Each structure stands twice: as C-alpha cells, then as structure tokens.
Amino acid sequence: MAASQSGRASSPLDTFPRLLLNHAAVRGDRPATREKYLGIWQTWTWSQVAEEVRAMACGLAELGFKRGDNLAIIGDNRPRLYWAMCAAQMLGGVPVPLYQDAVATEMAFVLTDGEIRFAIVEDQEQVDKMLEIKDQCPSLQHILYDDPRGMRHYTQTCLQGLDEVIAMGKVHDKNQPDFIVGEIAKGRTEDVAVMLYTSGTTGKPKGVC
C-alpha cells in the first residue's frame, strides 16, 4: 500500500510516484540517490528526493504542464534529470528522454512528433540546441535548464532556470498540499511511464511506449 502525505498507507504501490512517496514515508532518512560531483559524493535521502520531485512537479504545473503532456528531458545522467521523469509522471505526463549527444536537427523531429511543449535540459549546450530548432518546433513553449552557467545573458522569454521552477513549486506545494496528492491519485497502472524514440537508422525515429 502507498503512503499518503501523512505517511499512512492509502493506495496500491502501482505507480512510480506512489512508490516514491511510500519510500519517503517508511525510509525517509535512508540514501536514495548518490552522485560524485567534483570528486565528492553527494547524497540525497528518500525524503529529500520526494520533496524535490514534488516541488518540480508543482512548478511544472504552475507553468501549465498537465496530464497527457510530454516532457522532453535532455542531458547527462544527473539526479535532477531522473527526478524530472518522476515529476512528469506525478502530473500524468510522459517523460521523453533524448540522447544528449544528438544534434539539434535530430531532436527537432522528436520534439515535433511528440508535440513537446516543455523541455528540461541540462546546460547551455542543450539550451543552444533547443533555441536553434525552436522555430521548427511550434509546440515548444518552455525550455528549463538545470545548470545556469553561461546563461546570464540569455534573454529569450521561453527560458527559465530549473532552480526558479522548483522554488515556485515549493510555494505552490505549501499553499496547496493536496494538489500533488490528488494528481498522483489519478495515476493508473496502464498510464504510459516513458516514451523512448528509436535511433531512426532504418527510417524516421519512432516513439515507443
């Protein structure tokens, strides 16, 4: 059974967001994610991860991300990019990871085919790719970046730092604590968990759910 906001079991553990909240309730102080950054191991507990994912999901909701939307995620294997996948799932959205070394023109097809409105990217390199093809992707409205280095002089209104989105989400979650719980409760086992696009070596890439 999944844990409710108060930590009590309330629903089956049949979706990733419910599993995350359950882990935060029953083993909140245990390590959930570790990453070596600049030679030093960084550790996040289950409670910390759940808090970050909730805040990210609420921030996305504030920007208009909703059930059925696809979320492009582009970058190296970093904790926040994995958390973004679960944040999309909390809202009933579908994460669409893209290969970070793909050139911009290859990404354009996926963004258009997947009708992507939101993209969470790692850094300036990926932002530049998104801006290069934005005119080819009419649905793309929000480009959210994790690493702010090099972004100071970018003025495009479609850009926003992920830190800002998470901060906005924390306020949203504090003011409306039942919102994300309700969204998670809407999740079903038959919901699409992730969409992966094929390489396209024998034709156009295809989204596989």
Could you say what each language-model-derived stretch is?
Residues 45, 66, 94, 204-205:
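Short coil/turn motifs that cap or connect alpha-helices
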Residues 71, 88, 119, 192, ...:
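Conserved S/T- and glycine-rich ATP-binding loop of Class I adenylate-forming
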Residues 21, 58, 62, 90-168, ...:
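Structural core segment of the AMP-binding/adenylate-forming
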Residues 1-14:
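Flexible, non-catalytic linker and terminal segments flanking ANL/adenylate-forming cores
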Residues 28-31, 160-166, 170-197, 204:
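Conserved pre-ATP/AMP-binding loop-to-beta segment of ANL
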Residues 19-44, 150-151:
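AMP-dependent adenylate-forming
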Residues 87, 207:
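Hydrophobic/aromatic ligand-binding patch that stacks against planar heteroaromatic rings
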Residues 32-78, 82-86, 103-108, 161-166:
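Conserved AMP-binding/adenylate-forming core of the ANL superfamily
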